[in-house]
């Protein structure tokens, strides 16, 4: 059960990282004025903050909770 929970949390965090990386790439490649995102720099900065947040959480998970039992 612990292994299943660990893998689920790890996948959740990595999925969020991938989502926000994709958002930055889309924003950078399609920098067209959109009503919801008029300030491209601010939008990308927010996405980078979310990437950093999820990467920090993933690092903590791997540092403190990854054991041989989980592998």
Residue ranges: model-predicted function:
Residues 1-71:
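Extended, charge-rich alpha-helical interface modules
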